[in-house]
UniProtKB/Swiss-Prot annotation:
Annotated family: Belongs to the NIBP family.
Name of protein: Protein brunelleschi
GO-annotated biological processes: actomyosin contractile ring contraction; Golgi vesicle transport; intra-Golgi vesicle-mediated transport; male meiosis cytokinesis; meiosis I cytokinesis; meiosis II cytokinesis; meiotic spindle organization; spermatocyte division
Chain positions with Phosphoserine modification: S317, S672
Keyword annotations from UniProtKB, A to Z: Cytoplasm, Golgi apparatus, Phosphoprotein
Record organism: Drosophila melanogaster
Any one GO CC term of the record: trans-Golgi network
Compositionally biased residues, Polar residues: 314-327, 345-361, 945-954
Superkingdom, taxonomy of origin: Eukaryota
Region (Disordered): 313-411, 923-954
Compositional bias per record (Low complexity), positions renumbered to this chain: 362-400
Length: 1320
């Protein structure tokens, strides 16, 4: 743009020619219409006192004034804090550069100070006297004395009051108008007075404009720029061209005055005319001025929003909430209605009634907090909505809406269009470029054009104008060059050219500290470099830099290193450490391993002077530097939240739920609710921690540096409840993963957020949070519920511990163990001592449970604990103890099971199948099912001589038994060497305790621990064979047992209340035990239970029915086990126990002898009722009458009965003689068939007996029942297709048939009748 033009109209001899001393970088096109007023503080700086006054004055930057003809004018005021005097010389060239007003503000406490303030004000008037129209002085004096104000408070204030100007007087040479206020005065009328001051400036300006407009064209003088005075010396000013030059320049000057006086339309016309006139004579400098004036006047109408409140000068560290310089690109395309307003036929704007007698004063929201800041900070005019009212004797000051919004008609036809403004600015700049003394004006024009193009959304034009500024050759100081770069930076930022803005900002920073500078300003350099972060896609928060990962790493690293150097030169070691930490945190992945190592060492050296901490740093100018953390140094590979040890983990106390109503099921899935719940509990840990209990988090770390990395004071980072974290110190080897356990104690209850950990490495304290760790699938945090404190206990037992703990489930809760060895049937006890180790919590809840590797039923027989005794000792106070006694009984199966071979060898009618035996099977000590086997039938054993002699011995009188050795297979039984129950058995069990107390008990939490029991059971005694024999009385029977001593010691066996026997080690003996027979009531109850269960099975369509014989056999087995207890004692020791007959298997003949017969016998011999053991005597040849009466005392009828009578002689040596045809004769049948014997029915049979020889005879009277032969089984009638009919048929069969129809039974009259026959 800047063409090389050879012709220079501005040349001259030596000497410094007048020029603008410096550009006004804050100028905009709209400032052409403003009245320039100097606002200056005088006297000592009292920022807190005068700040309010400065704000009030600066608010009045726009007024509405009615001119002499009644038309409203919009007058704008521009307050500046400083104005070079030589700029007034350019007032003819551009009138807005002329200072027209002066306002000073000062504070005094005495007359001397007031005089000094007046003197300073007058000196300013003299300095700018050539252009100054009006001036005002605002003085703040001391407050009234307290004693003087008491009267005013107590009474009404005086009409006039004591005025400050009455106490203090201004010097006589002070001619300016002064306003006096007390220090605490609210200055309510100050804005109104400043409005009057602005109005006065307007009228003076208006008079000058009118004077200029009335000048005759032939009498006007030539207006000159300061450097042009020598160019026109000796020229003929009456020439045609010079006359046109004079008229054109005056016309341009009048246009400037009209623009300031609010006559924008007139100014446009004048600028156009002046431009044509001056262009015709080749007056390039002033042609450029008219073109710039046209642009300014058009911009006032097109872009009134440029007068609105400008952006506050915010502190660079205070970013807007929720925004980030890396996330939001500065607004490049701002909305503008400029082009719309040109083409629109009617403008739609917010109109304000101009007849309202109010004055709109606009506020300037400045960030200045002191008078001194006003001296160093440029002032900008802006709009506000604070209205005040004022009156004037010469004009009416009305409400002043923002001009351009009050548009009653279309825009003027001669206004420049939007695209023409930038073209006219180009022309103006080209014209200015022809004059080297106009370089400052050229620079300002380029800046104004840039701001207009920003409003027009023309970033390329903005960049072109700004680039042209760099080529303008200006003689300026380094400070001015820095200022120029800063302004260019700001404009580039407004159009979104962040990198260009950052380049110039960094260039300005380097200018402050360039080589050769006598006073390098590192503070300003640091500030500017910090401000250039945005352009390089950096921000002060390292987390956002890492998250966005934008920009150019090489440039970013270089910038941060330069910033570190500046911080070091400032002597701010903490700041240098912070930036070096920032560099390592954000650029770690962009560095080579060598650079990483070098930077780490450099950080270590910097932190040696001042260690880094994870807290924000606040600089002197208010900039906040966020904390930087070495999140990946060391590198966290994994982090796991550990549960408490198993015996300390909290568990819920199970409470039986009350029935709250019917259970409702729906297949509908509420997906949104499910997703919300999953998202909510995504980071929730499944277990809980306990208040005041040490908790653990395991971290796996890796050192990425090539040297050892010491890490000290490593702690957990938490949020939520109070958590006391314990420090950890370690040294990490290079590139070696290392596990670290971090511990801490929650002090309160509630939710605990585990956010990460803190480290102290390389001299920097860092908070390493999980959410900031990149490249790992860590959640933002872990949420752990902390429940109330639980008591802790220690457990000891009175038994020795085992070498190894239990292998059962939940073995991790075992805290101690106990081992015990018992013989089968032996009892013992174990005392468990529980100590409450809590310092404050009582043990209020204690419950136990036992788990073992045996079935529950057997377990309950082995282990017993008195629960009521435990409850009686609760609660246990802190440091108190409670003793729990565990009774242990070595439960075992003492009845020897029969091998499978004997199951098939038994041919008795009462043989059982495997299915029937399962109904009363027992469990062995090893935990596996052991089905008791049925022994051989007694009928077979009776044929053996040994058994025969044994029975005879029992029936003959008290037995004389001797110990006998049992061999495998001998005696019809099974030898001890083949018994599986003779081997040692091992039982593992756990006694588990759940305990709680305090608030945790109320919340429903407890702990669980266990004691492991290792119980070894040794074989003691075993029942190898058994039989049932009739006793001397009908109400009893003899249970004959073969008992083996499986121990290695002699054993004393107590098998009745009064009878004992000694058994040698590994020997056996046979003992008879009298037992009461099972009552008929129990048999009847068993029959009823069997019928009910079979009926239930039929209703449930079960085909397998129960057999009454099985139920009766089981009943008899249980009857024997309940009544027979064999006590044993190992001689010479205190080891003793009890052997039970649980699981004994009985054949059908044994069952008939065990249970009470369903027949009631009444036998008479010679009309005398036979009683047991009664002696019956008769003579040889005498006919004796034998009467037998049977009664069915069962609840079922009996069928197919056969009553038989046999006489025999017992030789008492095991031999019985039934061949007595020559010795006894029976008159009548000795076998009588009874087809049916109903319940409670009686049958009687009578016969006569004649004995032919004397002797002792016995009569065997028995009744047998034979199984009923049926073509079709009753069960076959019960079909699934017809359950109702099957039920009725089944019931009829069950209740109509007797239980003897399925088995053969033999019921004898016990004992046999003994008859002694004597000679006559």
């Amino acid at each position: 743009m800047r063409a090389a033009v050879g012709l220079m109209l501005s040349h001259g001899a030596g000497g410094m020619e007048p020029a603008l001393s410096r550009p006004d970088y804050e100028q905009s096109a709209l400032h052409h219409s403003c009245l320039l007023v100097l606002l200056r503080g005088v006297g000592p700086s009292r920022a807190r006192v005068l700040q309010r006054a400065f704000e009030k004055v600066r608010r009045v930057n726009h007024i509405r004034v009615n001119d002499s003809s009644g038309h409203p004018r919009s007058i704008w005021i521009r307050f500046v804090h400083d104005h070079p005097v030589e700029h007034n010389d350019w007032g003819d060239f551009q009138t807005h550069r002329r200072l027209l007003g002066l306002v000073t503000i000062g504070k005094f406490d005495s007359q001397i100070e007031l005089n000094e303030l007046c003197r300073q004000h007058e000196s300013l008037k003299v300095r700018y006297g050539s252009t100054l129209y009006e001036s005002r002085a605002i003085f703040f004096g001391p407050d009234e004395q307290p004693l003087e104000t008491i009267g005013e408070v107590l009474g009404p204030p005086a009409a006039g009051g004591r005025r400050l100007q009455d106490e203090f007087t201004t010097p006589s040479n002070f001619k300016a108008q002064a306003f006096f206020y007390r220090e605490q005065d609210s200055c309510a009328d100050l804005e109104s007075r400043i409005g009057d001051f602005a109005s006065a400036l307007f009228w003076v300006l208006e008079s000058r404009r009118l004077e200029r407009s009335r000048e005759k064209a032939d009498k006007v003088s030539l207006l000159l720029a300061p450097f042009e005075k020598r160019d026109f010396v000796g020229l003929d000013m009456e020439s045609r061209n010079n006359r046109k030059r004079c008229v054109g320049r005056v016309m341009k000057n009048l246009a400037d005055l009209s623009l300031q006086a609010g006559l924008v339309d007139d100014a446009l016309s004048l600028y156009h005319n002046a431009n044509e006139t001056l262009r015709s004579v080749g007056d390039s400098l002033w042609v450029g001025a008219t073109e710039e004036g046209l642009c300014a006047a058009s911009a006032m109408l097109l872009y009134p929003q440029m007068r609105e409140t400008e952006t506050l000068h915010r502190n660079s560290s205070l970013q807007e909430a929720g925004t980030s310089p890396l996330k939001n690109t500065p607004e490049k395309w701002r909305a503008s209605d400029a082009t719309k307003k040109i083409s629109a036929s009617d403008a739609t704007a917010n109109n304000v009634d101009s007849n309202q007698p109010q004055q709109r004063v606009t506020s300037n929201s400045s960030s200045c907090s002191s008078v001194s800041s006003l001296v160093t900070t440029a002032t900008n005019s802006s709009a506000s909505d604070t209205p005040t009212t004022s009156s004037s004797s010469t004009s009416t000051i009305s409400a002043a809406p923002i001009p351009g919004h009050q548009r009653n008609g279309d825009l003027p036809g001669n206004i420049l269009k939007a695209e023409e403004i930038s073209n006219y600015y180009r022309k103006a700049i080209i014209n200015y470029s022809k004059y080297r003394h106009a370089a400052t004006i050229e620079t300002e024009a380029a800046l104004k054009a840039s701001r207009i193009c920003i409003e027009q959304n023309r970033p390329l034009d903005v960049a072109m104008f700004l680039q042209n500024i760099l080529y303008i050759n200006l003689s300026m100081s380094e400070a001015e060059r820095v200022k120029r770069f800063e302004v260019i930076t700001d404009l580039y930022q407004q159009i979104g050219y962040q990198r260009k803005a950052a380049f110039f900002q960094r260039l300005a920073a380097l200018k402050h500290v360039q080589q050769g500078s006598q006073a390098p300003d590192w503070n300003q350099s640091y500030r500017l470099m910090l401000g250039s972060f945005t352009g390089y896609r950096l921000c002060l928060d390292p987390l956002e830099v890492i998250e966005n990962a934008a920009g150019w790493p090489a440039l970013q690293i270089d910038l941060v290193q330069t910033l570190i150097t500046a911080a070091r030169r400032l002597g701010h070691s903490a700041l240098a450490t912070r930036h070096m930490t920032f560099l390592l945190q954000t650029q770690w992945d962009n560095m080579s391993p060598t650079e990483q190592s070098e930077m780490a060492v450099q950080l270590q050296n910097l932190s040696a002077q001042c260690e880094g901490s994870p807290v924000p740093l606040v600089l002197e100018n208010g900039t906040v530097i966020p904390p930087a953390n070495l999140t990946d140094l060391p590198y966290c590979i994994d982090l796991q939240v550990k549960d408490l040890p198993a015996h300390l983990r909290p568990q819920r106390i199970k409470v039986a739920k009350a029935d709250s109503g019917p259970f409702l099921f729906t297949p509908i899935h509420f997906n949104s609710v499910d997703r919300r719940d999953k998202k909510k509990d995504k980071n929730k840990i499944a277990f809980q921690w306990v208040q005041n209990d040490l908790s653990e988090v395991t971290v796996r770390l890796r050192n990425p540096l090539p040297f050892e990395l010491p890490v000290t004071d490593m702690r957990l980072l938490t949020n939520g409840v109070v958590f006391e974290s314990l420090p950890q110190t370690l040294v990490l080897q290079p590139h070696v993963p290392t596990y670290v356990a971090l511990h801490g104690t929650p002090i309160e209850t509630g939710q605990l957020d585990l956010q990460g950990y803190s480290t102290h490495t390389l001299g920097v304290k860092s908070n390493c949070r999980l959410k900031h760790m990149r490249g790992r699938s860590f959640p933002p945090n872990y949420v752990v519920d902390v429940i109330p404190a639980l008591p802790r206990i220690s457990v000891k037992t009175s038994l020795p511990q085992t070498a190894t703990f239990s292998n059962m489930n939940s073995a991790d809760i075992v805290v101690t163990s106990a081992s015990l060895t018992l013989y089968n049937g032996e009892s013992s006890s174990c005392t468990i001592t529980i100590t409450n180790e809590s310092a404050t919590l009582p043990l209020e809840h204690l419950e136990f449970s036992i788990n073992s590797n045996v079935e529950q039923e057997l377990q309950q027989k082995i282990f017993r604990i008195d629960e009521e005794a435990i409850k009686a000792h609760l609660p246990v106070p802190p440091q108190g103890t409670i003793e729990i006694i565990v009774d242990v009984f070595a439960e075992a199966d003492f009845v020897c099971p029969q091998p499978p071979a004997s199951l098939h060898s038994a041919a008795a009618p009462g043989d059982y199948g495997a299915s029937s035996l399962t109904h009363y099977s027992s469990v062995s000590t090893s935990g596996h099912a052991s089905l008791p086997s049925r022994v051989g039938s007694p009928h077979h054993r009776r044929n053996e001589p040994q058994n025969s002699s044994f029975r005879s011995t029992i029936s003959g009188g008290p037995p004389s038994l001797a110990a006998l050795t049992l061999h495998p297979g001998g005696g019809g039984g099974v030898g001890p060497s083949s018994l599986g129950s003779q081997y040692n058995q091992h039982i593992e069990a756990q006694v588990r305790f759940k305990y709680s107390g305090g608030d945790a008990l109320t919340a429903g939490y407890c702990r669980q621990c266990a004691v492991s029991f290792n119980l070894e059971l040794l074989p003691s005694v075993q029942i190898t064979s058994w039989d049932v024999l009739p006793a001397e009385v009908a109400s009893q029977f003899y249970l004959v047992l073969d008992i083996s001593n499986l121990t290695a010691q002699e054993m004393s066996l107590n098998y009745t209340d009064t009878k004992n026997i000694l058994i040698e080690a590994k020997e056996s003996c046979r003992v008879p035990i009298p037992v009461d027979r099972c009552s008929l009531e129990k048999v009847v109850a068993a029959r009823a239970a069997e019928v009910a269960e079979n009926l239930e099975r039929e209703l449930c369509f079960r085909t397998q029915l129960l057999s009454f014989n099985d139920a009766l056999s089981k009943l008899c087995s249980i009857h024997i086990a309940e009544r027979v207890k064999i006590k044993w004692l190992l001689t010479g020791t205190d080891i003793q126990g009890i052997a039970s007959l649980r699981g004994i298997v009985l054949s059908q003949s044994m069952v008939d002898l065990t249970a009470v017969s369903p027949l009631e016998w009444a036998i008479s011999f010679q009309d005398t009722l036979v009683q047991p053991h009664n002696e019956i005597v008769c003579t040889v040849g005498q006919r004796s009458l034998l009467s037998i009466q049977l009664a069915n005392q069962s609840l079922q009828p009996l069928r197919n009965l056969v009553l038989s009578i046999k006489f025999y002689q017992d030789y008492l040596n095991g031999m019985e003689n039934y061949n007595l045809e020559t010795r006894v004769a029976i008159s009548g049948p000795n076998r009588i068939a009874i087809p049916l014997l109903e319940k409670q029915e009686q049958k009687e049979h009578t016969c006569s007996v004649i004995f032919f020889t004397p002797g002792r005879f016995k009569a065997s009277i028995e009744c047998t029942s034979n199984p009923q032969k049926q073509s079709e089984q009753p069960s076959s009638l019960l079909t699934r297709s017809c359950p109702a009919e099957a039920e009725s048929v089944g019931q009829s069969v069950m209740f109509s048939s007797s239980y003897d129809e399925q088995q053969a039974h033999v019921w004898k009259f016990i004992p046999p009748i003994e008859v002694t026959v004597v000679e006559q």
